[in-house]
């Protein structure tokens, strides 16, 4: 190249071009790409006035305007990418221009739309104001109770008849389309309304569409003339019926979350009851248990009415010695029957408090735990239990392996953020094994914690609910613990939960027996049905292959009718769940969670349905490390098998599209779309199975807290704590921090009005950010540090509300990226014999995706560039 350019170009231009070529090569471009990049640059110099100020502004904003094109590492077809992205930017810029006369009508529509949104936002307050005078009146108060019940019965009967007509009325394709457009229009109108009315309306619309779909499936879509099609169709219909039941029960469960708030305790502390705190442990490391005990010692409660117990089912001498040193009680069993339930029941023989609070050994309570929860027990004498959320300050395997910690609601956020709050409305909150307070008298009446199943917590409160006792839930995190460290441990925990809930369903079915209210029965059944999702999810992941591979019509209907029934059912359910669950579960993430677990919970739940006494309790490991990133091939094997199976379906589908009957082309397309969606979800499951590094023994917790540090010469620096762990802190100094590098300092933290001092070493300094490593602490200093950090009353309060609202389309894009990431990991970690195949496929997809235009990365300086671009 240098010889050719030396011959064609003058020396200064040649030198600059050679420098550009070397820069391209230094950034990883191939010789061909670098040469071609230089050629495109020469053409740009010839035909484009790059020295013009407008072009200079565009070049300055290259990273914002062309985020997917690396100017330092050119690719052969970059000019095509520039052309596509430029057209995209010009279209976007033209849309933002000031409306011209011919577009005034459109501008008027925008104004109407804005006024409509404002009116909808103000509607709930207006309705509340207009009907305020009716709050203390009954519209039918002058009628007898019997007459009111009769009127209510007539209204309900009329509503049911109308609903039955809406569900069962057959429509031709055009009528079905018009009906769906009407419902969709109403949904779009009400979804922006704040308050619960819009959620209730969306539930009604979703149930109408979903019930029509299920009715249509049962009455019009089974092929009774073909045995293979009939069997495959019935299998899919079974899975769809399960999903429909869970959808209906889920809507019922969360239709009106209670959002219970604390009740103040009496000022006279002599009226406060005595409480025993149980911390059961079996094989966990002492360092995991220490923080829980240290935090329990600092709980704001009269010390003469608070007893802390370590329930050591491992019988370890170091635990006994630790309990003696810190002044808590210690119990070790000689026999170990019934695992955790037996351990707690054994301790109940010795503890004499009026209430018992149970914490898993890694759950660190806040100082306010009892003051926030005990007031309700004094107010309601029939209240047997107050449950609070299980909050985790470390990422679970999904969050860590996908890099989504505190960016996307985790798997448990939906349950503890919404479902238990909904259960509380129906008096169906059940015990979750930790972070709860239980009244001793009702617990003693049923013989302590239930031991017949491996989910003893839920079973215990099913029994108490049958006896007429109530339970409560407060959605304010008052303790935090460690999430499971590996995907295999996470799956093992979920297998135990699934087996236990199915055992309860078989041994103490909430649908039968005395004592439960109808709403309680439904809530318990939904909790148990949730863990039966394994087989239906596997059916959905393989269902389209029945048509592609075996020519079995699983839905015996024209492709147009399938689209007119299936898509509205899915879209309405997604829109409604996004409205209800948006803060607690983002759209499409349930498919990822269920797919990862499906293969593993299907066999144990099936076995538990047949033989509920089979199975054993397994302890979930906490506090482990992951030294190196790796693919868990044992866990991911089922996902890879399903991926290969669906890829076979893709190959057969392509062949059938080109060589099959023309009348089936649309059905093949519908099936292929389903297969590609399944491949995306399976790719996400594969991505989760890539274990990311976890080399910190102490997890960092982000928080903002004022503090100060003192040098050995007594000089004080005010600072703000940004994060902390059991071994150190990250702080931000208000001033120059370089002078502290390598020094020994004292960290000053406050708890209430009292100040505590902790010795520390400055480990790193970056600007005004300082990393502190705690020096060896005495036992009392360690207790004080835990109570100043982990056990602060406000440490976890805002975590549940920190997630962004769900946006279904953006969430779908996240899932697409996640699926592709899974296949890239397969290409990276696959055996050499198949690595080449995966690498070619992922490279091909990456190459195609690289041409898709991107939304500019907006900055304050980007706007002039947009204007310059639009003027070229």
Give the role of each language-model region.
Residues 360-364:
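The conserved acidic donor/metal-binding loop of glycosyltransferases
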Residues 274-276, 307, 459:
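Cell-envelope/extracellular polymer assembly enzymes that use nucleotide-activated donors
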Residues 294-305:
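Short, acidic, metal-binding catalytic loop of nucleotide-sugar glycosyltransferases
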Residues 2-271, 523, 533-537, 659-689, ...:
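N-terminal membrane-anchoring/stem segments of glycan-assembly enzymes
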Residues 253, 331-355, 367-454, 465-466, ...:
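Long helical/loop segments within the catalytic core of UDP-sugar-dependent glycosyltransferases
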Residues 463-479:
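Catalytic donor-sugar/metal-binding loop of nucleotide-sugar-dependent glycosyltransferases
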Residues 7, 13-15, 629-872:
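Structured alpha-helical
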Residues 312-319, 335-336:
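A conserved acidic beta->alpha catalytic loop
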């Amino acid at each position: 190249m240098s010889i050719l350019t030396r011959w064609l170009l003058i020396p200064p231009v040649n030198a600059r071009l050679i420098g550009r070529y070397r820069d391209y090569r230094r950034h990883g471009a191939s010789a061909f790409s670098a040469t071609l990049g230089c050629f495109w640059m020469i053409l740009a110099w010839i035909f484009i006035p790059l020295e013009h100020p407008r072009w200079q502004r565009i070049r300055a904003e290259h990273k914002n305007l062309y985020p997917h094109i690396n100017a330092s590492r050119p690719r052969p077809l970059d000019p095509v990418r520039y052309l596509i992205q430029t057209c995209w930017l010009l279209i976007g810029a033209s849309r933002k221009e000031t409306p011209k006369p011919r577009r005034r009508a459109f501008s008027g529509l925008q104004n109407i739309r804005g006024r409509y949104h404002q009116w909808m936002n103000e509607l709930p307050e207006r309705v509340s104001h207009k009907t305020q005078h009716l709050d203390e009146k009954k519209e039918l108060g002058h009628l007898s109770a019997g007459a009111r019940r009769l009127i209510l019965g007539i209204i309900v009967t009329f509503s049911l008849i109308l609903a039955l007509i809406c569900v069962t009325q057959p429509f031709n394709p055009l009528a079905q389309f018009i009906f769906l457009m009407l419902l969709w229009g109403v949904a779009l109108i009400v979804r922006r309304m704040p308050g619960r009315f819009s959620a209730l309306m969306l539930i009604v619309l979703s149930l109408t569409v979903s019930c029509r779909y299920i009715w249509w499936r049962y009455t019009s879509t089974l092929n009774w003339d073909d045995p293979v099609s009939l069997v495959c169709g019935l299998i899919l219909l079974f899975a769809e019926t399960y999903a429909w039941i869970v959808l209906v029960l889920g809507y019922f469960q969360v239709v009106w979350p209670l959002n219970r708030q604390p009740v103040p305790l009496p000022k006279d502390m002599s009226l406060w009851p005595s409480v025993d705190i149980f911390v059961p442990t079996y094989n966990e490391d002492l360092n995991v248990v220490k923080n829980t005990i240290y935090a329990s010692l600092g709980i704001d409660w009269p010390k003469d009415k608070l007893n802390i117990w370590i329930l050591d089912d491992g019988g370890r001498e170091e635990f006994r010695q630790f309990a003696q040193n810190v002044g808590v009680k210690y119990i070790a069993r000689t026999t170990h029957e019934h695992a955790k339930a037996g351990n707690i029941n054994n301790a109940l023989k010795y503890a004499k408090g009026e209430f018992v609070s149970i914490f898993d050994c890694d759950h660190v309570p806040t100082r306010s735990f009892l003051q926030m929860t005990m007031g309700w027990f004094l107010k309601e004498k029939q209240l047997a239990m107050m449950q609070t959320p299980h909050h985790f300050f470390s990422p679970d395997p999904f969050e860590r392996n996908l890099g989504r910690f505190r960016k996307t609601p985790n798997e448990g956020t939906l349950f503890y953020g919404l479902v238990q709050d909904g259960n509380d409305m129906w008096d169906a909150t059940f015990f979750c094994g930790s972070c709860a307070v239980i009244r001793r008298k009702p617990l003693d009446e049923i013989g302590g914690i239930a031991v017949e199943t491996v989910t003893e917590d839920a079973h215990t409160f099913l029994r108490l609910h049958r006896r007429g006792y109530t339970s409560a839930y407060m959605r304010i995190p008052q303790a935090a613990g460690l999430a499971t460290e590996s995907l295999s441990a996470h799956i093992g925990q979920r297998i135990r939960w699934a087996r236990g809930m199915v055992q309860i369903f078989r041994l103490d079915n909430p649908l039968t027996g005395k004592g439960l209210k109808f709403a309680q029965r439904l809530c318990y059944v939904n909790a148990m049905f949730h863990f039966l999702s394994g087989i239906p999810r596997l059916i959905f992941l393989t269902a389209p292959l029945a048509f592609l591979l075996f020519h079995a019509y699983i839905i015996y209907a024209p492709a147009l009718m399938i689209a007119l029934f299936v898509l509205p059912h899915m879209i309405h359910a997604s829109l409604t769940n996004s409205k209800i669950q948006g803060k607690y579960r983002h759209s499409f993430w349930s498919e990822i969670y269920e797919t990862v677990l499906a293969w593993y919970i299907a066999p144990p739940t099936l076995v538990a349905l047949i033989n509920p006494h089979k199975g054993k309790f397994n302890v979930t490991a906490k506090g482990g490390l992951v030294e190196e990133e790796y693919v868990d091939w044992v866990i991911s094997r089922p996902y890879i098998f399903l991926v290969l199976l669906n890829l076979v379906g893709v190959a057969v589908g392509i062949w059938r599209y080109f060589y099959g009957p023309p009348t089936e082309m649309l059905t093949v397309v519908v099936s292929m779309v389903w297969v590609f969606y399944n491949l995306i979800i399976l790719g996400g499951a594969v991505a989760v199975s890539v274990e990311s590094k976890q080399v910190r023994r102490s997890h960092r917790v982000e928080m903002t807290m004022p503090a100060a540090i003192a040098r050995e010469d007594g000089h004080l620096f005010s600072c703000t704590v940004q994060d902390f762990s059991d071994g150190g802190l990250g702080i931000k100094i208000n001033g120059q921090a370089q002078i502290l590098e390598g020094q020994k300092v004292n960290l000053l933290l406050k708890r209430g009005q009292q100040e505590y001092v902790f010795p520390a070493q400055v480990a790193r300094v970056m600007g005004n950010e300082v990393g502190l490593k705690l020096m060896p602490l005495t036992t009392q200093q360690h207790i004080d540090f835990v109570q100043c950090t982990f056990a602060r009353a406000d440490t976890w309060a805002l975590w549940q509300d920190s997630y962004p609202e769900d946006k279904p389309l953006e969430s779908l894009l996240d899932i697409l990226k996640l699926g592709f990431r899974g296949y890239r990991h397969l290409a990276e970690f696959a055996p050499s014999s198949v690595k080449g195949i995966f690498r070619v496929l992922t490279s091909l997809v990456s190459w195609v995706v690289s041409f898709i235009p991107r939304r500019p990365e907006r900055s304050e300086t980007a706007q002039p560039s947009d204007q310059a671009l639009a003027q070229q």
